[in-house]
């Protein structure tokens, strides 16, 4: 969604140290803590360590269903898009892992300058604290999309080959498609599908594949709410659908949920309610693409599903590696 940026930072290969861990079954807590410590400094880990970490992440994600069942309390986060230093701001205001349980709604990569470090950090946290860090798939967790919008090129630039990109995109295929919190809050990256009436229909999708160009899996990752829309409309994105209050109400009633929480669209205020608070958009990339001027938000749900929004701004310029000059926006999605 919205404006994209040309990534001109760090155009030469970054220095990557020697691997510190072996096969995934030998990946120790100590190894993961070392990876997390390094990635929290926005430093790359060795290519072999990426391979091992991704293998471990796949093992964990493979045990999770298409619809993750999550208990409150939990903090819900929207798109990050490789804005590593803003992810650090998110953890400052939301609390560190494992003190806070997190659910990220996808779109970890593309457009920002640090998609590699961002995604690998989230994976390392997932591997270290699998019940505290929940990740679901966004439309940018896709081989095709990442070859266009920055992640593929970033992997080539930082590692000198496409191996890291291949390891990461294999993980994409294992990410869950949705989540449900306490049986009452349905979470998804994009939105609803005319092909899906019940969560059980999501549970039987074969998710371990590249995101299709159409169909229910595509719709979950690409659809958007549209005020005044009746039924289902064609999406200007070229994938997914526009859905209105009627479709949202029907889905909630059929599945016994009170709220549909999603990301996928830039919201200048960080979050936005739709359809009499049946649908909520959460956006967690402040000053999107280092030029949009928006704030970001996260949503904390307590043990009783009471909602508390936290608004935060982009990391100060002196704390980040992005150039001060606003990059040229050359495309929309």
UniProtKB/Swiss-Prot annotation:
Residues 1-28 are annotated as: Disordered. Disruption phenotype: Severe embryonic lethality associated with a high incidence of male progeny. RNAi-mediated knockdown causes 20 percent embryonic lethality and 18 percent larval lethality. Abnormal meiosis and mitosis leading to defects in gametogenesis and embryogenesis. In spermatocytes, defects in the organization of astral microtubules. In oocyte meiosis I, defects in autosomal chromosome pairing resulting from abnormal synapsis. In embryos, RNAi-mediated knockdown causes abnormal mitosis due to defects in astral microtubules organization. The modification Leucine methyl ester is found at residue 333. GO terms for biological process: cell division; chiasma assembly; dephosphorylation; double-strand break repair via homologous recombination; embryo development ending in birth or egg hatching; meiotic cell cycle; regulation of meiotic DNA double-strand break formation involved in reciprocal meiotic recombination. SUPFAM superfamilies: Metallo-dependent phosphatases. It is an enzyme of class 3 (hydrolase). Belongs to the PPP phosphatase family. PP-4 (PP-X) subfamily. This is Serine/threonine-protein phosphatase 4 catalytic subunit 1. The gene is pph-4.1.
